[in-house]
From Swiss-Prot:
One of its GO terms (biological process) is mitochondrial electron transport, ubiquinol to cytochrome c. Its main location: mitochondrion. Heme b b566 binds at residues 98, 197. The lineage of its organism: Eukaryota, Metazoa, Chordata, Craniata, Vertebrata. SUPFAM superfamilies: a domain/subunit of cytochrome bc1 complex (Ubiquinol-cytochrome c reductase), Transmembrane di-heme cytochromes. It comes from Oceanodroma tristrami (Tristram's storm-petrel). The chain crosses the membrane at residues 34-54, 78-99, 114-134, 179-199, 227-247, 289-309, 321-341, 348-368. This is Cytochrome b. It comes from the Eukaryota. The gene is MT-CYB.
Amino acid sequence: MAPNPRKSHPLLKMINNSLIDLPTPPNISAWWNFGSLLALCLVTQILTGLLLAMHYTADTTLAFSSVAHTCRNVQYGWLIRNMHANGASFFFICIYMHIGRGFYYGSYLHKETWNTGVLLLLTLMATAFVGYVLPWGQMSFWGATVITNMFSAIPYIGQTIVEWAWGGFSVDNPTLTRFFALHFLLPFMIAGLTLIHLTFLHESGSNNPLGIVSNCDKIPFHPYYSLKDILGLALLLLPLTAMALFSPNLLGDPENFTPANPLVTPPHIKPEWYFLFAYAILRSIPNKLGGVLALAASVLVLLLCPFLHTSKQRTMAFRPLSQSLFWILVANLLILTWIGSQPVEHPFIIIGQLASTTYFIILLILFPITSALENKMLNF
């Protein structure tokens, strides 16, 4: 019989083993769709970003007007920009759902896959942050100033690091130039990390909603899940396109329609909605260094998940107490997101402090205790 190039060709063989003949659990739900949706988001962002970069000028005097020029004079420039800006929001919606699914179903017990995933999240956050600075509006400028200035909280070397990052004594032209370079580079780093993430995932195989080994009962990825993923892609592209066409500025900040002015501070500096939960945690601590450490901990706490797993069962599918705690955590994150968008005044300060404390207590204390309690209940 003639050899099948799909299975023998060095390149096609890799694609075949990852996307066609990949053995997949037969019972994975729609929550497992978000991996491929994230890949779609990345491709969309790189393509639209490449087209935008062709018309963008990384100079403080021209950046704002070059973005305006793209929207006004470039063929479909407005659409490309709207897809790129809102694509970032959908990217974060997908990654938060993906992390939530991993947390709920115990996927973090694949330690290498989970750790590369956390690294991907951090890289994505860095990419989104430097990208937000590029239009050089008021919120871009002041957001860059506030967030980069946090590094000055590091003892001894903090101020030096900040000035080194700025390329001067304030956020100015060198800062914008290097942020553009970083924003161009990081998505390709994300693409590389994604391949490492997938390599680790395919080493162990996918988890499933029951959390049990399904090696004896797997089905090929194509045509079953390839078709299911295409439905997911359509359901993602539909709201993204609708948003880009009908309400492109819904999630943006009106301040960013004003060109950057170092002499006028906006009344309320805040990042994009997807960083608000971390921003609320940062603001809830009155001490600068303490706030920065809490901000870092709010994301890095994910690295501890595999070590805090005390349950005999992998997923939360049959653990009602942990389920309740999980949804309380989700509600808590939504409260933090809301608090991050509010001004620093009573009652928002105390609500933010309570929500921040609750966030860490649930993750670090209540989940391990509840899991241990559920183990005890299994004996009765």
